[in-house]
Amino acid sequence: TSDELTAFLEEELHLVHLRYMRGYKNVINECIRLNESGVVSPLAIETSGHGALSENYYLDDGAYLAVKLIIAAARARVRGRTVESLIDKLNEPAEAVEYRLAVKNTDNANAYGESVLDSLEERALEVRIQVASPSYEGVRLMFPEGWALLRMSLHDPNMPLNMESKEPG
């Protein structure tokens, strides 16, 4: 998840953003767990767009979310605004890329990937690169101008490397 989304949610909307692992069911289950532990958590939404609301029993229901957006658009229009204006202050990174690094020539892609992640984190700490904590999946390296996240794919024998920068180039 981009730093810009976190800033928008926390600074503009005064919400709490939990950057959790990928996988819509993982996100929904964590949201349910948080609510059951007393942490108010009304929305679970995954990077892919899957989302669930507590008011709808945490069902992954795109039609329900679409109706909620239509209602928000109607309310915005009554106030002379557009639905797009609701996210006017949401900034985008200057650049964002993803590379999928294939894991080959091994019988256990997950074990190999975990060893790569362990080595990356160890080396990053040795050279004093900030490692995000907590990190629920992979290793997220933090830089003044952006971040990089290396993780295991949920479904394929590869390691996605996502990078975002606040500066072009």
Regions found by a protein language model. Name each.
Residues T1-G169:
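Phosphate-binding and adjacent anionic-ligand microenvironments
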